[in-house]
Amino acid sequence: MSVCLTEEQKRKIEENRQRALARRAERLAAQQNTLKQTNNSHSTLFNIQKSTVEQGALFSGQRTNVTAACMAPLQQGSNNKYAFQKTSSGGSAASSLPGTAENKPQAGGNGPCDYKVPADPAQDFTSSKNLTGKYVAPKAHCVSSVPSFNDTPNPRQLNPACTTQEQEKPKNSSYSYSRPDSDTACDKFTAGPGPGPIRNTTAISKFYGANPGIKPALPVSNKTVSEVRDRGVTGSSVEAVPVKKASSSTRGRCVKHMEGRFRVEVGYSAELIALFKTIPSKAYDPATKMWNFGLEDYASLMSEVQRVQSVELKALEGMEGVQIAPPPTSGSGTNINALLAMCNNWQRPNATLRGRCILISRSRFEMEIGYHTEIIGLFKQMNTRNYDTKTRKWSFMLEDYQKLMESVRNIQQVEVEPLPRPVLQAFAPQFEKTTISLAEIEDVDLSHVDSKLIGNLMPFQRDGVNFAISREGRLLLADDMGLGKTIQAICIAAYYRKEWPLLVVAPSSVRFTWAEAFHRWLPSLNPESVNVIVTGRDSQSANLINIISFDLLGKMDKQIAANFKVIIIDESHFLKNVKTARCKAAMPLLKSAKRVMLLSGTPAMSRPAELYTQIAAVRPTFFPRFHDFGIRYCDAKQMPWGWDYSGSSNLNELKLLLEESIMIRRLKSEVLSQLPAKQRKMVVVAPEGITAKTKAALAAAAKEMAKGFKSKVQEKEALLLFYNRTAEAKIRSVLEYIIDLLESGREKFLVFAHHKLVLDNICEELGKKEVPYIRIDGNTSSADRQSLCHKFQFSEKSCVAVLSITAANMGLTLSSADLVVFAELFWNPGVLIQAEDRVHRIGQTSSVNIHYLVAKGTADDYLWPMIQEKIKVLGQAGLSEANFSETTESTDYFYKDPKQKTIYDLFQRSFSEQGAENDSDEALLLEACEEVDLGESTCGPTDYSGNACKRRKIDDYFAL
């Protein structure tokens, strides 16, 4: 079927063809100019048979077709000599002069390309002289059967002068090979990948293909001849000469793109594109189809390009003096590139026996493979071998890995999968000399960080900060819940304060908690520099610290500028699904940032696929392709509909890899001696989702209380209304926080609330999420209480205990949990402490975490400081623990105007120990709070629901 092209398409095709022809003509002209310059610079005479054509030489009387003209210019001097072996007929080689007997084709069928290098080059160098007294090099003619690079000799093997001169030349900062403008001719004809021993002397004559009648202009000393022989045959120059890339490699250059960035102009290379995708500051321009990068990544990019054998890049102009680290090698000379090269082309489709290598500890690896006599023989040759009779598997120290793999690869019918590249890179020092113990991380200088923050770090938290800085601020902090990931992250971020602005991405329920934490731990920080982004209309560019939720980040991905060099991701497991909007928005920011701190108490080790995005965010170079990660660690299987990555495999190796490179994880049981018995935390939540009616009621209640009241009854009515409205305002934030806890992997915890409306909403939400729960309130009988407690204590699945503060604060044992959440506050701190002790009882083996949810702009603003003050007074009297405030992560409330102070005093006076005349009075007040119908009530002081008897009791109470 013919394809009709438009005139525009035909025109573009013709233009492209003309450009291609023009480029080809330019290359040919450049090659001819280079050829002429080389001839002039070396004064070399080329003797070509008259029957030679312009594009290839054809010798008369022979059927050999020559397809290319290969030049072999040699530099003058006593140390620059080529020698050729005698012909098979016994005649000695002579100079390439017309009419000489030596220059005629031999009758034995040996053409001009059949000469060989003699075993002793001195034979020909000393037996013949050039009649002109000058050194004459032949123009080499290659036969049609072009030899491979493996069989192609390098002129450095035959010419020690080239090697010596190249060593004396300064290194080029571009680390790429291009034709130099120097007079070293042999540098211009490095065809092979590097010097090495001559495997086939016939290949040399085929490569040069010219009449070998070459004589030296000056005599050669025996010492020089021996050097030539030693270098050419033994290949000792490998250590002296840097390895050059093949002449067929893709060449490109680095050029300035814009201020602070450069681009790479190079042809297509799949390996190079994979490398580009691992650079943090990468950016692809679809219009020009070119990649550009930040100048801060120039050195690392050029260093990585050295590993790509098929690509050469010219240095960026003006960056020649930049120090570029060579490919990493171990101290004893073991090249990590040699280990990485084993990861390529290891598959053997015709293999009859297959196995794989697995890392089993930071010092040993295991080879899983079936029985094979040769393999067992190799295993027994390893000094560090160990055979496990239970698993019937062999293991070895990492220092034997290279030797064993090289030996196994020589067995053609055996295929062994090597260790992955990230494992080789992370444990590179271990392959040189294996050590069992971990290297100790030195303490970093934190003198420029706020002393208040440093003084509150526990020893294990200080170790976490040291680990993070040793990893250059890119890590996965996976400490167990309650071990202070927040304070560690703030300390790490403060260490890199000069690189701010800082972006914090957290669940919406804890955004304001992060803001309070920055104010508390960094007192030197201006409070105005912390910005919590609540809506998409909020600005984020003018502040040093910006805090945003995951959901809002997904909606504002185009508005969030990519200029954040330091990023903290709280609960980073929220990024487990790469297809979600939040993950798509976060990944580009994380890869372009210089410091990335991911915080997660549940790193999803049982499902490695959910961990991939976090690994890619911290170390993009580890696994550029998810499929490679899935094959190794997700037990990937190809199904009829595609690949299934839901499984897991080699989890121990993955854990070792992460702990060695990017992850630090401590469990409560490991650091229990450093933890207090109780750890209280104030979680600031935003009263979002409040209806206009409720918001107006809150404002009106606060306004009424600020006026002052004539009677005690009016005070209590106003406070009761304000307290009830607070419960309604907090419902949405409380539900979000509970769901975040469940998604974070929390299996068992207690939730205390006071209002029936709050308890009902929590139970309803748990039912929707199909989360098992128990509920104990004032309507639960004693028998049911015991059975529910037993169910919670011995449940192996996740379970939430929804409890009333006043009805379930005593007589219950729920020590199987170690987390307590107070959805609401209560004015009597004794009741709160009793509720805490439902978990902190005999049988509790862990530190207990207690979270108080406090909503700004509600009654919590006054209840929370009042509770702390009461506890302090009781502690001084010896009636309660005195360290309530000391073990609570909180911020003091400062009253900005007299009205707020008036409200606080009102709470203090009404709910103080002296304010309640007896317990029955307080019980009546509690009953009023529990029975009030928030959905139907208004701002009036008598908006209570319930039966007539209860209303009469309440009225009697307020009438006092």
From Swiss-Prot:
Sequence motif Nuclear localization signal, residues: 665-682
Location (main, coarse): nucleus
Domain called Helicase ATP-binding: residue spans: 466-621
InterPro entries in UniProt: HARP_dom, Helicase_ATP-bd, Helicase_C-like, P-loop_NTPase, SNF2-like_sf, SNF2/RAD54-like_C, SNF2_N
Helicase C-terminal domain ranges (all copies): 737-890
Catalytic activities: ATP + H2O = ADP + phosphate + H(+)
A Pfam family per the record: SNF2-rel_dom
Source domain of life: Eukaryota
Gene Ontology cellular component list: nuclear replication fork; nucleus
Binding site residues for ATP: 479-486
Swiss-Prot/TrEMBL keywords: Coiled coil, Hydrolase, Nucleus, Repeat
This protein's record includes keyword Repeat: yes
Amino acid composition bias (Polar residues), ranges on this chain: 145-165
Motif stretch (DESH box): 570-573
UniProt protein name: SWI/SNF-related matrix-associated actin-dependent regulator of chromatin subfamily A-like protein 1
Record gene name: smarcal1
